[in-house]
Amino acid sequence: MRGPPAPGHDVPVSAEDIEAYENDLELDLYREYRDVVSLFSYVVETERRFYLANAVDVQVRTNGGEVFFELSLEDAWVWDIYRSSRFVKSVHVVTFKDVNVEEL
């Protein structure tokens, strides 16, 4: 059995290894989503994130002719494979892109 590499000796990681790792993370995230979706009242999609939340407030704002959206979410869960804790008390999002809010 081979142990870990000696300090200062990097082990090459292939693109396939990275892809398999990210696929495993994505599958784990999907399973977590499936387990928690029933705890929430809303699905919120922005151009950068996907959220579950129990309270959502969307305000349409303008500034210098530009239209943007301010979102406030309470008691939320964030779809993000790189976050160690996906449950958050509150989220504030400002976006110039489309926003989709659906009641579950």
Task: Pin down the residues of each PLM region.
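Conserved RNA-binding domains used in RNP assembly and mRNA/RNA metabolism
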Residues: 3-104
